[in-house]
């Protein structure tokens, strides 16, 4: 059976860009479990069945672990989005960024970025209206999955990443997505960190100190 999520992404990849193997396997896991919805010709993939998540939501808690949606707009829409984001029409931007996920309800995005050495990295584009985190999310696909398995409500908030999930007793309690966590651990024979900052070094939009993040350095050069 065709993996529609993966085909959508492959159809809009920048030249020279590769889908990390771990992301390919995640998309297959999503398709195999039926964790997707089709709307207006686009397939959206999730880490947890959406109806079950909605049904579990109360004033105090919910199921499902990290909320993130995987999708791929057309290349034309991708180009428009990144041009608007950076305020720059230079092909240097559209030829190196491919948005593949929404990381926050306020519009933050996850993207594949082609670095100067031709390697594909996973980066974060904060919406600016909520999250202002603009940095590398993971150097590789496995670390991205490990980050998702920690169990934050969303991975777009830099203030949350140095702390464990559910550290604030006054906030909604997010029950961990144990099936996804177990799949990551068992499939890749890996462990899940306790804190997001074991993987991510958050950087804010406009911050000139790159903290050794080549994506931040590149973003600071191309933004207008």
Locate the predicted segments by residue:
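A surface-exposed partner-binding patch
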Residues: 1-116, 181, 189-224
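Generic alpha-helical structural element
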Residues: 12-15, 130-133, 169, 173
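A structural signal for well-ordered alpha-helical scaffolds and beta->alpha junctions
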Residues: 23, 138-141, 177
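Compositionally biased amphipathic helical and low-complexity segments enriched in hydrophobic
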Residues: 105, 113, 126, 162-164
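Structural signal for glycine-centered tight turns and loop->strand junctions in beta-sheet-rich domains
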Residues: 118-120
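Compact, glycine/acidic-enriched structural inserts
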Residues: 122-159
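Secondary-structure transition/turn motif
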Residues: 124-129, 178, 220-222
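An amphipathic alpha-helical core segment
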Residues: 149-196
């Amino acid at each position: 059976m065709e993996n529609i999520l993966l085909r959508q992404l492959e159809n809009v990849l920048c030249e020279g860009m590769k889908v990390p193997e771990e992301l390919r396997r995640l998309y297959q896991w999503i398709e195999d479990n039926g964790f997707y919805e089709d709307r207006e010709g686009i397939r959206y993939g999730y880490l947890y069945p959406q109806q079950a998540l909605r049904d579990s939501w109360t004033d105090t808690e919910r199921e499902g672990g990290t909320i993130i949606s995987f999708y791929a707009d057309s290349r034309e829409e991708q180009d428009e989005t990144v041009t608007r984001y950076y305020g720059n029409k230079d092909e240097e931007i559209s030829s190196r960024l491919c948005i593949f996920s929404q990381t926050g309800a306020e519009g933050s995005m996850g993207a594949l970025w082609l670095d100067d050495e031709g390697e594909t990295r996973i980066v974060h584009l904060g919406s600016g209206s909520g999250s202002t985190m603009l940095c590398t999310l993971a150097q590789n696909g496995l670390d991205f999955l490990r980050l998702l398995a920690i169990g934050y409500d969303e991975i777009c908030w830099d203030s949350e990443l140095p702390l464990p999930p559910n550290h604030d007793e006054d906030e909604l309690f997010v029950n961990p997505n144990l099936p996804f966590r177990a799949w990551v651990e068992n499939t890749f024979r890996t462990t899940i960190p306790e804190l997001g900052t074991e993987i991510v070094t958050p950087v804010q939009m406009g911050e000139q100190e790159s903290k050794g993040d080549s994506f931040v350095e590149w973003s600071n050069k191309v933004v207008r």
